[in-house]
Amino acid sequence: MFSLTKSVLFTSIVAIAAQATTAVSSPTQTSLPGLASQVPNCVAVCLRNLHESIGCDVGDIVCLCKSKASLISKVGLCVVGSQCDFEDASSSTDIVRDMCDLVAEDPGTAVIASASKVLDAVVASATTSDIEAPTSTNAAGLVAYDVVKVVVVGAAAAIAI
């Protein structure tokens, strides 16, 4: 039941953010391949698990970013549903948004190809062993942690749109 509540809350935040018309900050001054190399392990695992439902190859940044809001929402929900550490959870949608913003600026075929190769390698090397699995001794703490992740990732998604 609590998981459904988290999903509904996150989806509501994303829907509200989609209606917002405020300007967002420009992406960082990092290159597209540089951003692809900074994708946290947790986000890479999510991309590996989500790319087929999005309809793109995992390293096809242009395809993944065609529906930026949907990609950010799906990555955010995946991160919230996993046991990612707080830092990865809070930066997950920022890095995806920044990559898609740079793709939208059409940096050229060579840059996109390079970034796609980097992202493909990052996703291929991502492991689930670094992601904490819940145990009976930490379950209560994880509930509070999950609530914090919902708020942080939801806020990041709201800014991304």
Swiss-Prot record:
Amino acids binding heme: 60
Location of this chain's protein in the cell: Membrane; Secreted
Signal peptide positions on this chain: 1-23
A GO CC annotation given for this chain: extracellular region
Membrane topology classification: Lipid-anchor; GPI-anchor
Disruption phenotype: Decreases virulence in maize stalks. No sensitivity to Congo Red (cell wall disrupting agent) or sodium dodecyl sulfate (SDS) (membrane disrupting agent), and in vitro cell population growth appears normal.
Parts forming coiled coils: none
A GO biological process held by the record: effector-mediated suppression of host innate immune response
InterPro entries referenced in this protein's UniProt entry, alphabetically: Extracellular_membr_CFEM_dom
PROSITE patterns found in the cross-reference section: CFEM (PS52012)
Keywords: Disulfide bond, Glycoprotein, GPI-anchor, Heme, Iron, Lipoprotein, Membrane, Metal-binding, Secreted, Signal
Domain spans labelled CFEM: 24-126
GO molecular function: metal ion binding
Disulfide bridge map: 46-78, 56-63, 65-100
UniProt main location, coarse: membrane
Database matches in Pfam families: CFEM
Domain-related comment: The CFEM domain mediates interactions with host proteins.
Role of this protein: Suppresses host programmed cell death during infection by binding to Z.mays WAK17 isoform 2 and Z.mays LRR5, to prevent activation of Z.mays WAK17 isoform 1 and the downstream hypersensitive response.
Family, per entry: Belongs to the RBT5 family.
Subunit structure: Interacts with Z.mays LRR5; the interaction is direct. Interacts with Z.mays WAK17 isoform 2; the interaction is direct.
Record protein name field: Effector CFEM5
